[in-house]
């Protein structure tokens, strides 16, 4: 059998039956060929390297295919310009980080991306040139791109940007409250009581279980004291039960401070003292652990817890009667002490004198024989009020001699007077009985009121508050009745005054003529609209809706403001908000007074009065809704809306502040003939408005309207815009198309130009014709400033004397102002100017001149001010008879009225001993006015000195030609004499002249 060797291992090979002979070329032997089976062959194991190679080739082919696809995709994308543009922007956009740590790409515009890319390329080029050594050894303009600091040994942390330290959890330790027993609380309370000495009460269950105690300092010790029954006058066999209060007594003794004490030392006043066995004598006198002092019986100490048969044999150790009395008196006396402390009290009287004073007051108000007697007290209690007063009066009469002795004590006389006055009766019965006789058997209301007042007066000091209240009410009712029936004033006329608004609208023919209306029924302005530009361009300002309406809401005037409803042009579509827009803002509503009416020849001029309701109350204005481009006219009935001239159809106009009265002239333009519209508008612009200016009075406006109606009579029937009257600021508001958000004003009755002209009459009596847009206080201050600034300006003062002479009356604010006006001879010029015009105005100047002469003779400011106050009444009487159509009439009249009332009030204050604060205010005001005068004088002197220097220079120039220039002494004397005559001063050197040099 054949074998095969595998190393050292031999493997047999079986012989195959069918042998195949194989001839070898060089071998003579015949070889047997055997058949090799599969089981004899080794298993084929493929190489791992080949597997990897196959996988690698597959992957390479896949990557090549993917790259080829990407390359083809890139070629396709490069052809898309929009996508390349977005890619370019994304490559050059910066990366930002949010607060939370998240990153995002901030997208740029294409232009910004190009700039950023160009900057990047430039930096790359500079870096390449720098690395290649292209830069030479010299300075270059630029900035360092990196940090110059060298970092040395520094700590490197491995914390990521997202690291956040976890806070250590706070361990909550639950604190358990310690339970405190009642014994601990009681110890703390008693510790405080022992320190302060305040009394403490132990409340027990049942009768006689309450215990009152207090810590007292006796014999240098702190000992608890129990309040016993016999201290209040009640004597019992056993004062208290020991076994009921044993625990309480232990706590009381626990906080007491005991020491060595002899039992014989105990005496009166020691009743209720509590001792325990720490005190030596306790064991000898009682078998109990505690001893409460009650008193002594046959020389032996008695405990309050012991039962005794005969309580009357015990000597109780209560306080002495005088000590008890003083203790009670002291407690109430300190509680009723006055609460005001104006000084530190001292001991100026001994105890005996103090006792006499206390007894005197006590027996005066509460006369008894013994204060401790219950019958004496009940006797006073049972007396009626009248009997008690009689009893007090009788007692005072019996003790009159003693009162005479005690009157020397300070303050006691006032007490005596008070008691006598409080108990005295009204002894003057004759007058009271006469009143009763006259009013007897009369049942009218006024007679009954007089009887009630008489009854209260008859009672005198015994009248109660109810009696006085009833008498005061009856007196008030009588006063009102008398006021309503007075005939000395015209106040009663207002009770029946009615000025109702007409229910029918006025008819304006110009608005009804078909020739002046278009096919829509609107008024056609024609030439009037073209010429109306003279109004809108000069005295109106354009309202730009795009800028909002807020700045036009507040309509200011010198003494207040009014709110327009222009903001309501923005209409909300919400129904609730739209209803809110219909509500106005009310001002303080004024009642009907004499200021609301105007009279002529004693009769009411109704168009010049305020409108009233049916019951006589004033008619208050309501919300006036705004419109965009209209002229609103008509004071009665529904308003009429006239379109503004259509020259600028898309523009809105509002009158400038101070020129709202131009709406009246614009309404008159409706009735002006077209061929006369140019003359009308030019006359208003060039003549009327310069005369009226801003904030004119209603009287001036009516006069200007009258002048225009003379040239254009057809305007008399023109309807007026609604005019609201503000009595608080003495202002009249002419309402335009923007309405009024402020409500509560009075309404003027005048509806046409013809009715408005009545305000121009001098015979018209009433305040409203002097109303203007502006207040009295502001107007007065303006007049004062104008007066002070004009004292040293003759031309300006002449204008004031001609146009507004009442302004000089305001010089009463300061004696210095009056003296300067007197020295400048302004009063004399006023007399010369008005002597042929109005004698009543001349009286004012003469009185002011006479007053100034008296003031100049006195140097004391307070006396000068008193002289001025005394003449205020006389000036007020004169000015009431003067013409009332002058600008400052109202302000000056009110100023004089204030002066008069202040003088009367100060007189009453001085009579009653009060201090007048206006004295110090007068000094301050005088200083301020003198400062203003000095400033004005300095300006005037400067101008005067310039002219004087020019004159002196000319004189010296002439003297220089006549005399030798070398004679300096003579020239100096000449210069000095001229300065004395012209400048009222004597200079040492002629420094004011620069023409000649005298050095």
Curated annotation (Swiss-Prot):
Active site residues of this protein: 230, 239, 271, 660, 733
Cross-referenced Pfam families: Peptidase_C6 (PF00851), Peptidase_S30 (PF01577), Potyvirid-P3 (PF13608)
The enzyme's E.C. designation: 3.4.21.-, 3.4.22.45
GO molecular function: cysteine-type endopeptidase activity; serine-type peptidase activity
All copies of domain Peptidase S30, residue ranges: 176-317
Disulfide bond annotation, renumbered to this chain: none
Record motif Involved in interaction with stylet and aphid transmission, residues: 370-373
Motif residue range(s): Involved in virions binding and aphid transmission: 626-628
InterPro entries for this protein: HC-pro, HC_PRO_CPD_dom, HC_PRO_CPD_sf, Pept_S30_P1_potyvir, Potyvirid-P3
Membrane-crossing segments per the record: none
Record keyword Transferase present: no
UniProt site (Cleavage): 317-318, 774-775
Domain Peptidase C6: 652-774
Keyword annotations: Host cell junction, Host-virus interaction, Hydrolase, Inhibition of host innate immune response by virus, Protease, Serine protease, Suppressor of RNA silencing, Transport, Viral immunoevasion, Viral movement protein
PTM entry text: Potyviral RNA is expressed as two polyproteins which undergo post-translational proteolytic processing. Genome polyprotein is processed by NIa-pro, P1 and HC-pro proteinases resulting in the production of at least ten individual proteins. P3N-PIPO is cleaved by P1 and HC-pro proteinases resulting in the production of three individual proteins. The P1 proteinase and the HC-pro cleave only their respective C-termini autocatalytically.
One GO-annotated biological process of the protein: viral translational frameshifting
Statement: the UniProt record of this protein carries the keyword Iron: no
GO CC annotation: host cell plasmodesma
Family: Belongs to the potyviridae P3N-PIPO polyprotein family.
Domain writeup: The N-terminus of helper component proteinase is involved in interaction with stylets. The central part is involved in interaction with virions and the C-terminus is involved in cell-to cell movement of the virus.
Name under which the protein is recorded: P3N-PIPO polyprotein
Organism taxonomic ancestry: Viruses, Riboviria, Orthornavirae, Pisuviricota, Stelpaviricetes
